[in-house]
């Protein structure tokens, strides 16, 4: 029985899925906006939201937890130096998923994933 198993498999092994979501989370936190397929975007939201919540409380333990989940020092620095303070007033809902049409090759539904409080474009 698969009761209470709420994540999407995305047609990948568990290690491949974890690595893919880690890479996508790192890309989103670095660039603050990415385009991917809709099911991946919805699953990515479940990975990134807790990371930003970790970044709101700058402690050594939280930095180590964030590094364990991202494996990227630059992302951890940005998470605790820029993104955490930016989202202190917001209690969740840091990621926006917008439908973005369909991919040309296989007509897969695409989504634009972005952080909600982006700085103004220069």
From Swiss-Prot:
Q: Spell out the InterPro entries in the cross-references.
A: Ribosomal_bL17, Ribosomal_bL17_CS, Ribosomal_bL17_sf
Q: Which GO terms describe its molecular function?
A: structural constituent of ribosome
Q: Tell me the disulfide pairings in this chain.
A: none
What UniProt keywords are attached to this protein's entry? Ribonucleoprotein, Ribosomal protein
What GO CC annotations are associated with the protein?
cytosolic large ribosomal subunit
* Record-linked Gene3D superfamilies: Ribosomal protein L17 (3.90.1030.10)
GO BP of this protein = translation
| Superkingdom of this protein's organism | Bacteria
**Keyword Calcium set for record:** no
Any Pfam family: Ribosomal_L17
Q: Which family does it belong to?
A: Belongs to the bacterial ribosomal protein bL17 family.
Quaternary structure, per UniProt, is:
Part of the 50S ribosomal subunit. Contacts protein L32.
Tell me the protein's name. Large ribosomal subunit protein bL17
Q: Which organism is it from?
A: Neisseria meningitidis serogroup C / serotype 2a (strain ATCC 700532 / DSM 15464 / FAM18)
